[in-house]
């Protein structure tokens, strides 16, 4: 797992975790806006973005990695932690491991009630199509489509250059 950091490390820490099929750049605008007053940490989950070569293991494993990172680099506590979709699942798992790790938590688009059938089906699709859904090629396709479909929401050119090379 890789971490992109914005702002002064002495400011309160905010961790924003992207969803499946996305990467740290999902929160780039927010990080730039918040970095004047906060130390913003944008992780890249294994199997996503530039970490596509590392296999994503599980929500539980990712939460343990975040717990270790926060303990080591943020004195064991952050002001806020947020996640969307898969990122939100990881936030919930992280809070179950240490409910005092953050003052605030923002969870969007994540399942709060276990769905075993959905989990099995999701695992099947990720095993069969994971490289197509979450690899570098998928990132390139998303960036191209974003510019065409939602030009006002397109990512900065430096990100497009990085991923489209």
Regions from the language model: what does each represent?
Residues 13, 39, 78-80, 103-104:
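Structural signature of beta-strand start/N-cap positions in the alpha/beta core
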Residues 27-28, 51-57, 116-119:
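Conserved catalytic-core motifs of eukaryotic protein kinase domains, centered on the activation segment
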Residues 29, 93-97:
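Active-site signature of alpha/beta-hydrolase-fold catalytic machinery across serine-
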Residues 83-87, 91:
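Gly/Ala-rich beta-loop-alpha elbow adjacent to hydrolase catalytic centers
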Residues 96, 102-133:
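Flexible "cap/lid" loop of the alpha/beta hydrolase fold
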Residues 116-118, 135-165:
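Conserved alpha/beta-hydrolase catalytic His-Asp/Glu region
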